[in-house]
């Protein structure tokens, strides 16, 4: 997580771009690197300074119907983690659970079939990647799993039992060990204390409290006129069609929400206000914990937190979209950039656009 944020700090010290037209910069990068669609937002506590989507939903059809617009959904990938963390925080504030609630206090009958190394893990451990759960960040790990049955929640429960019987990560001296799978286990804890599925909880808390729509899975499964994710086959960037078998249900709480850029900007703005001291849906102290409560990675957010700099950030990609968010507490501003391609060239373009936005808007 912090590799990208460190790169931002290094590059931003030598920027020469002076308030250029960001649209022209993005258009040029998209053309050069074959990126179908890009969106970006610049957010302050009381306004949205810039909000644009550019390009087309897919590489194979470019017309008025597939032209980018602000109602387009983008897959957030691992930026879903901040949403799951937000839901957990809401339940903590409403006394449904605590950050220090132990998994096996909620599921004591699982102990005998689980690895004793996990007996003391807490909700906070799971959401901050400190539970030493195996990562499940590659498709190969999922391909080797048994065929779990039932609805998504039931499958995740079987997945969690499988995970807790595995050996823990051999971490050496790392502060945290990034794990998508840990979020699936954390989601079970939230489901247990509420009697509601993770999907229902996110709908209730994000959609109803924030008035922001969310979609589970790929945008083009909602509507064929939504953006298609893209990946490379035979050196060609191709769209991922909605009937593709690529499915993230087991890791949904870690990385399978899609949102429109305006609605995701609402979520980021809410967090920005919170870390700047505003009580809103959550208390300001809770936002501070979510973003900065733990070193390097807290609850759904990577961070740099010292006397000079307070930044929180996250990138997300399941290989077909890319999403990046940065909250700069010192300058009271946040940035979001999304794309429906996650190639190396796409990620470098996103970094270039980010630096251009920071040069133009950060004061």
List where the protein language model places each region:
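Short, gly/Ser/Thr-rich active-site loops of penicillin-recognizing serine hydrolases
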Residues: 307-310, 341-363
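Short, well-ordered beta-strand elements
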Residues: 324-341
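Short, glycine/proline-biased beta-turn/loop segments that scaffold the active-site neighborhood
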Residues: 98-114, 208-209
């Amino acid at each position: 997580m912090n590799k990208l944020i460190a790169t931002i700090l290094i590059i931003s010290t030598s920027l020469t771009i002076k308030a250029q037209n960001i649209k022209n910069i993005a258009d040029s990068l998209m053309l050069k690197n074959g990126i179908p669609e890009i969106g970006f937002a610049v957010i302050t506590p009381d306004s949205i300074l810039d909000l644009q989507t550019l390009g087309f939903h897919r590489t194979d059809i470019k017309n008025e119907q597939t032209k980018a617009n602000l109602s387009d959904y983008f897959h957030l990938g691992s930026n879903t983690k901040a949403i799951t963390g937000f839901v957990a925080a809401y339940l903590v504030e409403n006394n449904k659970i605590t950050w220090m609630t132990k998994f096996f206090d909620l599921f004591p009958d699982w102990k005998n079939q689980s690895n004793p190394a996990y007996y003391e893990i807490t909700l906070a451990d799971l959401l901050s990647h400190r539970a030493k759960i195996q990562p499940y960040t590659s498709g190969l790990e999922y391909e080797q799993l048994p065929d779990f049955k039932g609805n998504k929640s039931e499958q995740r429960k079987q997945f969690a039992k499988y995970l807790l019987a595995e050996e823990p990560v051999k971490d050496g001296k790392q502060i945290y060990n990034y794990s998508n799978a840990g979020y699936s286990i954390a989601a079970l804890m939230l489901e247990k204390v509420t009697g509601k599925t993770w999907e229902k909880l996110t709908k209730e808390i994000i959609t109803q409290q924030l008035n922001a729509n969310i979609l589970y899975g790929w945008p083009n499964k909602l509507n064929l006129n939504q953006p298609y994710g893209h990946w490379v086959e035979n050196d060609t960037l191709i769209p991922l069609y909605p009937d593709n078998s690529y499915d993230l249900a087991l890791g949904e709480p870690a990385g399978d929400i899609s949102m429109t850029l305006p609605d995701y900007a609402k979520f980021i703005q809410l967090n920005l206000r919170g870390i700047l001291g505003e009580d809103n849906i959550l208390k300001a102290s809770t936002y501070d914990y979510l973003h900065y409560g733990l070193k390097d990675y807290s609850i759904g957010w990577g961070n740099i937190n010292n006397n000079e700099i307070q930044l929180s950030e996250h990138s997300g990609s399941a290989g077909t979209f890319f999403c990046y968010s940065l909250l700069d507490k010192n300058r009271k501003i946040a940035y979001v950039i999304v794309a429906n391609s996650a190639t190396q060239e796409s990620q470098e373009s996103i970094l270039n656009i980010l630096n251009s936005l920071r040069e133009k808007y950060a004061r």
